[in-house]
Amino acid sequence: MSLEVIFGSNILLILVAYFIGSINFSIIVSKIFKKSDIREKGSKNAGATNMARNFGFKIGFLVFFLDVSKSFWFAIISAILRDFVPFFGAVITQLVVLFVIIGHVFPIYFKFKGGKGAATNLGMIASLNIILAIIGGIIFFAMIFRWKIVSLGSFITPFILVIFMIIPWMNSSIIAYVGYSDFYQPVRESFQGAWYLSSLFLFLAALIILFTHIPNIKKLIKKEESVLKFSKKSKKLA
């Protein structure tokens, strides 16, 4: 396989990933169903937590589900293309899915002002190993139960999961399909499946999420960060 094909296939999917990631469901849902821009309310963040705080748990969960889905399904589709379409045989799935997160944080459709990437990162994690996603959920909710601060769990949990991903079973088991065959055959044989790739790109994703939470970290230091509190009013989509 030529270098042109290797770079071309990865760049093509990176661009597609970025444009898909740029579809910010918080902004779209708030404008369509609530006739307002979520970026002008509450924390002004275009994410599921701010949606839940301002419009209720149900609509917040809808956005959360959609954000998780866009990275999860893009990872699955890109892995299928990698394994069954020769042109995409050298695609690094974890790399291209990282750009779904980047698109979510810096959406081209919304003046590069998007969400913080936590839910989209969860979709990437779930695609790599659903058990890892469950572990992440347990850690996240344990932190929420203890401190009732969503941002704290959002930027700490990804770094903890990077450590878990180093465990061989997490990145090379039968349910770790997306990360199992990272490169085309000659490279897979030389690097034994490039086991480190999933951990590497999860770490990069964690750094992005840490960056987006810098304002929250400053508030935490000043003890001004918001505690978990959803709207008690009954909210409907229409």
From Swiss-Prot:
Enzyme class: transferase
This protein's name: Glycerol-3-phosphate acyltransferase
GO molecular function terms noted in the UniProt entry: acyl-phosphate glycerol-3-phosphate acyltransferase activity
Taxonomic path: Bacteria, Bacillati, Mycoplasmatota, Mycoplasmoidales, Metamycoplasmataceae
GO cellular component terms listed in the entry, alphabetical order: plasma membrane
Transmembrane segments: 5-25, 61-81, 88-108, 125-145, 149-169, 194-214
Pathway(s) where this gene product acts: Lipid metabolism; phospholipid metabolism
Subcellular location: Cell membrane
This enzyme's EC code(s): 2.3.1.275
Keyword Ligase: no
Task of the protein: Catalyzes the transfer of an acyl group from acyl-phosphate (acyl-PO(4)) to glycerol-3-phosphate (G3P) to form lysophosphatidic acid (LPA). This enzyme utilizes acyl-phosphate as fatty acyl donor, but not acyl-CoA or acyl-ACP.
Domain of life: Bacteria
Keywords of the record: Cell membrane, Lipid biosynthesis, Lipid metabolism, Membrane, Phospholipid biosynthesis, Phospholipid metabolism, Transferase, Transmembrane, Transmembrane helix
Pfam families: G3P_acyltransf
Species of origin: Mycoplasma mobile (strain ATCC 43663 / 163K / NCTC 11711)
Gene Ontology biological-process entries: phospholipid biosynthetic process
Subunit structure of this chain's protein: Probably interacts with PlsX.
Reactions that this protein is recorded to catalyse: an acyl phosphate + sn-glycerol 3-phosphate = a 1-acyl-sn-glycero-3-phosphate + phosphate
Membrane topology recorded in Swiss-Prot or TrEMBL: Multi-pass membrane protein
Family: Belongs to the PlsY family.
Main location: membrane
